[in-house]
Amino acid sequence: MPTPHEAEKQHTGPEEADRPPSMSSHDAAPSGPPSRNPCCLCWCCCCSCSWNQERQRAWQVSRESKLQPLPSCEVCTPPSPEEVQSWAQSFDKLMHSPTGRSVFRAFLRTEYSEENMLFWLACEELKTEADRHVVDEKARLIYEDYVSILSPKEVSLDSRVREGINRKMQEPSPHTFDDAQLQIYTLMHRDSYPRFLTSPTYRSLLLQGAPQSSEA
């Protein structure tokens, strides 16, 4: 017959067998947070930094795709003699001709006033936009590039027009810069256009289209 001590051991044995084995100091789960990435401020920053970088790259690609710089030449085909002669009839005919705008823009570059044509073209492009987000972004860039007094390409606008633009920029539309565009158009018409008609650039185009005299 087992003694009371042996009976107690037999009673407690199965319970101890069912217990999970105790973990050693090597198997114990770490009590602190996961190890930090040395390049981040906290253990979760690594994913956050990577996500922010991807978002920044996507925004930059989107911005560049929407706002490509204007080409240095609208068309590359030479104008006909009749077209060249029509540019002297009126400034409107010059500006309605893609080739005429390209030639006139090259002339403005020699006078260090190309920004006037660039601004006018940017306003024309803005008028074709219907997407609200694109309009907002392009209007902001036009303002920064040609209206802001901090821009090296600032165009000459009077205070009344500037104040009107500042009000309209609170809610931009495709016609935010209409008054400013008209003012720059008038400036080019009265100031640069007469000099263009007497410039070597225009005269050479007229001579190229003139009929050559034949000798008998």
From Swiss-Prot:
Modified residues (Phosphoserine): 24, 97, 151
Protein name: Regulator of G-protein signaling 19
InterPro entries listed in its UniProt record: RGS, RGS_sf, RGS_subdom1/3, RGS_subdomain_2
Subcellular location: Membrane
Biological role: Inhibits signal transduction by increasing the GTPase activity of G protein alpha subunits thereby driving them into their inactive GDP-bound form. Binds to G-alpha subfamily 1 members, predominantly to G(i)-alpha-3. Activity on G(z)-alpha is inhibited by phosphorylation and palmitoylation of the G-protein.
Region (Disordered): 1-30
Gene3D superfamilies: 1.10.196.10, Regulator of G-protein Signalling 4, domain 2
Signal sequence range: none
Region Interaction with GIPC: start-end pairs: 207-216
Subunit text: Interacts with GIPC PDZ domain. Interacts with GNAO1.
Species for this entry: Rattus norvegicus (Rat)
GO molecular-function terms, A-Z: actin binding; G-protein alpha-subunit binding; GTPase activator activity; identical protein binding; myosin binding
Biased composition (Basic and acidic residues): 1-19
Stretches of the chain forming a coiled coil according to its record: none
Keyword Nucleotidyltransferase attributed: no
Boundaries of every RGS domain copy: 90-206
UniProt main location, coarse: membrane
GO CC annotation terms, alphabetical: brush border; clathrin-coated vesicle; cytoplasm; cytosol; dendritic shaft; dendritic spine; glutamatergic synapse; Golgi membrane
